Amino acid sequence: MVYNVLKYNIVDDEIEAVIEYYESLSISLGIRAENEMLSSLLHLKNHAHNYLLLSDNIHRRIPVKSFPYMFVYSIEDDIVIVKMLFPQKDDPAKLWERLIS
């Protein structure tokens, strides 16, 4: 099944902030971060069910290869809804706070 992938508006801001951070370290690192995040999002179009369910059994996560971030999303019918780009180093309690707010 091919899914439509939609993102909350804040996800674009989070992606841009991560790219800017890595570009401040190295332009090539910023480009690589952007490519890996886009690759993760594109992978959801065909493989959304392949990733780990979180403990609420509603949301899933897909890691961003080579970077300490993950996208958190849910699946509704044929739509993947990306809700956040979450730093894996952050306290998981923050993830749940953001999901319920």
Which positions does each model-derived feature cover?
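Arg/Lys-rich, positively charged N-terminal/basic patches that mediate binding to nucleic acids
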Residues: 1-34
